[in-house]
From Swiss-Prot:
CDD domains per UniProt: SHMT
Subunit structure: Homodimer.
Family affiliation: Belongs to the SHMT family.
Protein source organism: Methylobacterium radiotolerans (strain ATCC 27329 / DSM 1819 / JCM 2831 / NBRC 15690 / NCIMB 10815 / 0-1)
Function: Catalyzes the reversible interconversion of serine and glycine with tetrahydrofolate (THF) serving as the one-carbon carrier. This reaction serves as the major source of one-carbon groups required for the biosynthesis of purines, thymidylate, methionine, and other important biomolecules. Also exhibits THF-independent aldolase activity toward beta-hydroxyamino acids, producing glycine and aldehydes, via a retro-aldol mechanism.
Cofactor requirements of the protein: pyridoxal 5'-phosphate
EC identifiers of the protein: 2.1.2.1
Positions of post-translational N6-(pyridoxal phosphate)lysine modification: 242
Pathway per the UniProt entry: One-carbon metabolism; tetrahydrofolate interconversion; Amino-acid biosynthesis; glycine biosynthesis; glycine from L-serine: step 1/1
Protein name, entry field: Serine hydroxymethyltransferase
Keyword Heme carried by entry: no
Alphabetized Pfam families for the sequence: SHMT (PF00464)
Keyword Amino-acid biosynthesis (UniProt): yes
Length: 434
């Protein structure tokens, strides 16, 4: 065997056969540590979930090798006949899940899905209406640093101070005053249902498009445990992770064929080139899972668990914005306890409970500090936690935060260590990827 042939064989064997632990031990170690974190800590970040092994397998498949600019049957590259199958399945399953006529599954994120809608429906400088970030909106709904706040003219509505519910009178007043091109319902920190019919009525009164960003509650909509944006919305955007429990990505849904064509053009070639076909395959798998009866049981449990967690925290003396939750998330207002979200997040992290600091309506703290934390139940529910477990978790949180309030920013190390031990005992009862 010549030296060249031997080298070629060695390259082929190692390149295509070497596992990650051999090919890149540093990355392998980081992955292993992250797996351990997910297995042994309680995940309460509302935007996170735990996907099935089937979704992981699809996303880590050879479809990552394929470029496929365009749409199924209309690609700019050859060899797309099999990735077309994956995308067609994702599209058809999405349409069944949300009972709509058109779906674009190519956006790489919820943010890009929103950008696609903006590109299709507005011109730079046009006005749109969205929920204020401080009241539970999202960066892509007009925050000044975001492209939505730089290229367009956002006008923000907020919640009522007395009950932290959407102020629909203000929405109507602002719509009449500013005549927006688009009105958005949806956000990242609003725990109540949205009055989609009233939003559409307001949009129609000023000739605006009504857009729903259901990134956080799409899985609940798919399962029928949350009101659907359709038939009220002209367009709905979503992520495909969060409550939908798929890979990280985005999607645009509509019943309007003319708008669907605009959204398709906005995503490709407007914003993206070749779509991530391995991620689209993962989306198809997740949508297939969401069409099964088991997913409805899961989604109902997500909501029941969230209510149980909120009730436990209220019983423990903590304030929940709007007094509770209708979906998978809640905001804990820590102002009455004299705590910041930053300190609470750190204390809970030391006890192996993961959440995120979050602003609360009319917050006076900086966004990097905040007066609250956001909690969600999707990931815990995916691993099997029920109402009893979330009541227990609520008790853990009360213990840690009470210790923080008593001891100061360093927290109560003895309480945190004790809670961490009980957290591990709980997660050991509900293993993932074992």
């Amino acid at each position: 065997m010549s030296a060249g042939t031997a080298a070629d064989k060695h390259f082929s064997n190692s390149f295509f056969a070497a596992p990650l632990t051999e090919a890149d031990p540093e990355i392998a170690e980081a992955v292993a540590k992250e797996l351990g974190r997910q297995q042994h800590e309680i995940e309460l970040i509302a935007s996170e979930n735990i996907v099935s092994r089937a979704v992981l397998e699809a996303q880590g498949s050879v479809l990552t090798n394929k470029y496929a600019e365009g749409y199924p049957g209309r690609r700019y590259y050859g060899g797309c006949q099999f990735v077309d199958i994956a995308e067609d399945l994702a599209i058809e399953r999405a349409k069944r899940l949300f009972d709509c006529g058109f779906a674009n599954v190519q956006p790489n994120s919820g943010s890009q899905a929103n950008q696609g809608v903006f590109l299709a429906l507005m011109q730079p400088g046009d006005t749109f209406l969205g929920l204020d970030l401080a009241a539970g909106g999202h960066l892509t709904h007009g925050a000044p640093p975001n492209v939505s706040g730089k290229w367009f003219k956002p006008v923000s509505y907020t919640v009522r101070r007395e009950d932290q519910r959407i102020d629909m009178e203000q929405v109507a007043q602002l719509a009449q005053e500013h005549k927006p091109k688009v009105i958005i319902a949806g956000g990242s920190g609003y725990p109540r249902h949205w009055d989609f019919a009233k939003f559409r009525e307001i949009a129609d009164s000023v000739g605006a498009y009504f857009m729903v960003d259901m990134a956080h509650f799409a899985g609940l909509v798919a399962a029928g445990v949350h009101p659907s944006p359709f038939p009220h919305a002209h367009v709905a955007t979503t992520t495909t992770h969060k409550t939908l429990r798929g890979p990280r990505g985005g999607m645009i849904l509509t019943n309007d064929e003319a708008l669907a064509k605009k959204f398709n053009s906005a995503i490709f070639p407007g914003l993206q080139g070749g779509p991530l076909m391995h991620v689209i395959a993962g989306k198809a798998v997740a949508f297939g899972e969401a069409l099964k009866p088991e997913f409805k049981i899961y989604a109902r449990q997500v909501v029941e668990n969230a209510r149980a967690l909120a009730d436990t925290l209220i019983s423990g003396g903590y304030d929940i914005t709007s007094g509770g939750t209708d979906n998978h998330l809640m905001l804990v207002d820590l102002q009455r306890k004299g705590l910041t979200g930053k300190a609470a997040e750190a204390a809970l992290s030391r006890a192996h409970i993961t959440c995120n600091k979050n602003g609360v309506p009319f917050d006076t703290q900086k966004p990097t500090i905040t007066s609250g934390i956001r909690l969600g139940t999707p990931a815990g529910t995916s691993r099997g936690f029920g109402v009893a477990e979330f009541k227990q978790i609520g008790g853990f949180i009360v213990e840690v935060l009470d210790g923080l309030a008593a001891k100061g920013e360093a927290g109560d190390s003895a309480v945190e260590a004790d809670v961490k031990t009980r957290v591990h005992a709980l997660t050991d009862r509900f293993p993932i990827y074992g």
